Amino acid sequence: MVWCCRVLLRKYGNFVDNLRIYVKGGTGGMGLPRLGGQGGNGGDVCLLAKKGVTLKNIKDKYPHKRFIGGVGVNSSVRALKGLAGEVCQVEVPPGIVITNEHGVKIGELDKEGDEIRVARGGHGGIFKTDFLPSKGQTRVIHLDLKLISDVGLVGFPNAGKSSLLGKISHAKPQVADYAFTTVKPELGKIMYPDYKQVSVADLPGLIEGAHYNRGMGHKFLKHIERTKQLLFVVDIAGFQLSAITPCRSAFETVQLLILELQLYKEELLDKPAVLAVNKMDLPNADEKLGELLKQLENPTGNLHSLPDELVPERQIEFKHIVPVSAATGQGLEDLIGCIRKTIDEQADVQIQELAQERLQSLHKETPRTVKRNFQTSPRHKHH
């Protein structure tokens, strides 16, 4: 049985994992024929990988998504060799693949400090060109965040993520009845009858305070950025890391997971999300599930059990809430279907957005018809 969120259609546009931008190198400067002066070259457009930057930052800061290098300085009597135009440097997140409009790969930026030129500036005017400059290189490029998987499993240690991954995919992760079994991302693939494949990553379990880089905090959260959607996995019986830590209910567990993502990078909450309530084979699981669903219908009214500092500012609207048991196989087919549905919906929205962007760019590039009013000369007047 599957409970769907009341919001039937969710906007997917807030988290950005690909971006289409226009880049143009600067035009070169004019040469000076009478003195043989050389114009300055136009500025290049370069991409620089920098931690902390996201594609959403770029989209918000530069809504026009146009980046143009500076124009080269003309040659003059005072400076026969003109200065080069200013380089337009665009900061992007590490882990980016750059392709042209036809999908041909231009390059990659894997780590902070990596840099690549994506548009060359034009040459300044010299004797060989009759001292006339050339225009800079113009192109439309795509920035794609390299994804480690389509789906990332999010949950506290021992929630059953590894067991779940093993049952819904062909992965064989290490499984044991103790926390922190997973210490690095484990990848699996869900195979569908129409040969569609969806990759799923079992990521190291979070702990409270992961955003402070406790446990494997930042390593885990960094991988979460590189997934298309999130699959929250919670134990219906709740979670307790150790005998000296508080015992959290399933509802509190969901809230704490949301909080960790929010405090690390709030836009992660804009990713499409599915909630799998695991271990439904345990005693009294159905009663606890009913209570959890009521709490999720009105989360803000059920946060009194958590201290103020552990209450998230935002909530996630789960596309689907699916009760499952990795041990018995209960609900796994429903979960697999919900994952596919959410992936397909997200792809449809992205295709529509890309088509709309291309139409808008074509509209801007279409030359406008200039209307002129011609006055009839006296000799053409009819008598």
From Swiss-Prot:
Q: Where is this region: Disordered?
A: 360-383
| Residues reported to bind GTP | 155-162, 202-206, 278-281
Domain (Obg): residue spans on this chain: 13-148
Extract one GO BP annotation from the record: ribosome biogenesis
- Which Gene Ontology MF annotations are present? GTP binding; GTPase activity; magnesium ion binding
Q: Name one GO cellular component term.
A: mitochondrion
Pfam families attached here? GTP1_OBG (PF01018), MMR_HSR1 (PF01926)
UniProt keyword terms in alphabetical order = GTP-binding, Nucleotide-binding, Nucleus, Ribosome biogenesis
Q: What is its main location?
A: nucleus
Indicate where this protein resides in the cell. Nucleus, Nucleolus
Residue ranges constituting the OBG-type G domain according to the UniProt record: 149-344
Q: What does the protein in this record do?
A: May be involved in the ribosome maturation process.
Stated family: Belongs to the TRAFAC class OBG-HflX-like GTPase superfamily. OBG GTPase family.
What is this protein's record name?
Answer: GTP-binding protein 10
Organism name? Xenopus laevis
- Gene label: gtpbp10
